[in-house]
A protein has these predicted regions:
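A eukaryotic "domain-edge + linker/cap" signature
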Residues: 1-196
């Protein structure tokens, strides 16, 4: 038997109770040692959050660029106009991420990368773009800056990498089917991704 729950402390108490009950009637295997495994999706989240720290500055620059464009209808209109000039299909929605949810960072980067040429041309059309992204956030704390080629390269690679994690997360988070038997295979796949 396998029990999969989220990481709430009340669940730890419930699983401990279940383990004690099973041990008292001698129905557990290995004393219930493997009865409760942490949620695979939560473990994946911890792995990805740690990895995001490696390219944090690039993510901050892309995020700031999106925030600038979305912060006003005239800016967004100019952005869409540049997308037409650059013949960039502008169906992807520019969204900001929630910093604590890596899957939203994945969605943000995936959409932003489709507009890389537009972001590259935007400073030519709006001088305030560069000024604002370089301006101090608060006294003594510089702005993140304008995303450069290195940042976009990081964003593309990270979006591709996170896409794999998104697929694994979907597979282990299924709520209408049993996933306990796939855990080892999925973690093995993650191990291969990380080692590449």
């Amino acid at each position: 038997m396998t029990v999969t729950v989220d990481n709430a402390s009340a669940n730890d108490s419930g699983v401990s109770y279940l383990r004690r009950q099973m041990n008292s009637v001698k129905t557990s295997i290995a004393g219930g040692k493997y009865l409760h495994m942490r949620c695979a999706a939560h473990i994946l989240n911890l792995i990805v959050q740690d990895g995001l720290k490696e390219v944090d500055q690039s993510i901050k620059r892309v995020r700031a660029a999106i925030r600038f464009v979305r912060n006003g209808s005239s800016r967004l209109a100019k952005f869409k106009e540049i997308a037409q000039w650059e013949k960039v299909d502008n169906k992807a929605f520019l969204n900001l991420d929630v910093c604590t949810r890596w899957n939203s960072t994945y969605d943000m980067l995936k959409a932003a990368c489709t507009y890389e040429k537009v972001f590259a041309r935007y400073p030519d059309e709006d001088p305030y773009y560069t000024i604002e992204l370089l301006s101090d956030i608060k006294p003594g704390v510089p702005g993140p800056g304008v995303p450069d080629e290195h940042d976009w390269d990081n964003a593309r690679k990270l979006a591709e990498f996170l896409g794999h994690f998104a697929e694994v997360t979907k597979r282990v988070s299924a709520s209408l089917s049993v996933t306990a038997h796939t855990y080892f295979h999925e973690i093995g796949e993650v191990n291969e991704l990380v080692n590449e």
